[in-house]
């Protein structure tokens, strides 16, 4: 069962986020560590910082390849930079790509992303804050800001680094006195649990965590027809673009093609222009090789004859803006020579130039929980509908003069959270994806609805992720006519648990919201009956059990209910517990005696009989238990509409290990819900949706509930 403390922490986090905590200028203090306060403590006490949250030792290194008994970690010593060199520096002469040399860890994907970051000083210093030094106010403590699943976090580290034979074990700088890159790698390892968790990944993962952007990947051999349009729009938005040529064998790595392009090498795309060439429009693309001096020698390369056949003013403009390592080529040659294109679209807060057009961005958090919201993909029609649902209202079509299609562009990015951290306990990436459906007419304009199984059985998706894949993120750019749509994110298989964020980027303003039920209860007025309305047989049974005082205690109620339920052989039940019976007495007891009289017991019994009818209706396979996936519909039949978060709590509390719900747990859930709703309504007499209570009232409610 989810601990109450976990729920309370989630509520607190939601409130802080609503107040702007997690934005780049107000980053979350990771593990509640305050860099400035910790640094000041160390300065005042004259000590160097040692991080208690990420101690320098075997667990920080890893669990398998870098585990405590691995040959790779034998002889490792943790040392501060001042123990390695005489004059350690944080950054020497500005951050450059030569500051990042790989060590004994397979995290080249991360280092390539850090290297690309050095090309954009403004973005770099969002991640690597100014004012850090091994000289002025040095206290052995540093900090970095990294984007993690929808929010920026400020990560504190000490400067104890793993070494072997007096040299850094992992990333290091070619400038041996410089340590910013090694400390950034340590901060990233801390976020993910240990260094080993960083092994293996995609450069786009690092791009996103250092910018807060969203990545798209294109196979240029199967590119969409409007690939040039996509590149042009991405550059207009200030996106980071990278391209590469696939390697087909180990011998291809860094191999140079006939026209001087390097295989397996990361290039940047920096411009896209149209020129008039011999009376026809020619599309040109500018490429940058950030690591070396090898440049393209084909058409439109430096000094090629094509430049003689365009307007001199165009030639001067295009060639004046060139930097070292940059070259132009035709878009046709680009598509033929290169294999892959990666686009990292920056969110508005990362763009500072006013002339850049911007995505409109919405971020949602969600969870897949076994038994309540982990329905799997469309191949699982019985459970697909229980996945979280998010609505997008596309209001305006794109502004594309050359495009006659009335359509809206938007990008959907689904990212699973914290899976690297799970590697230590055998977890890894789930296979994830999403589908997009048009909202039915009857549900348009409403957020307080969760589309049910029948809708998905009758309707096909309008779009979906290109594939379900076991990467941290899957994203696709989609074009659809203006209208209302829902996005259903899911794992490929049902019952897989994970947290996720869903990001929706639209070119024009749009309305996006989670599609979920409005919490409500259809509570009928209390049943009005008198002793004269009760059958004689029921009275006699009650009198035999209640005795002379004509009231039954919690203990007697347990005996009665379990005796009656035992007669229903079609029900699987462990019987009602004492706590369950206490909750029932709490619901029905009007005089505060903690006992039930004849009329109170009759009303309770009538409720249980009506709930039994509902339970049998949703025990679809007549097994005597109800699937927790049907719990949502059963609760609605009983008058209760709950949102996804509440359903997850209900299933965690009342379902068994196989996600089944037996009759006694079903009744206990309904008793609890009715008690809580009735109490809330009694405290919210004006119907404002808010109840105010003092500490004593709060404790009475929670202790009795």
UniProtKB/Swiss-Prot annotation:
The record's account of tissue expression is:
Ubiquitously expressed.
- In this chain, the stretch annotated as Domain III covers 348-517
Localization, UniProt:
Cytoplasm; Cell membrane
Gene Ontology biological process terms, A to Z: proteolysis
The segment annotated Domain IV runs over 534-704
Ranges where the Calpain catalytic domain occurs: 48-347
Q: Which reaction does it catalyse?
A: Broad endopeptidase specificity
Family according to the record: Belongs to the peptidase C2 family.
* Name of protein: Calpain-1 catalytic subunit
Say which species the protein is native to.
Answer: Gallus gallus (Chicken)
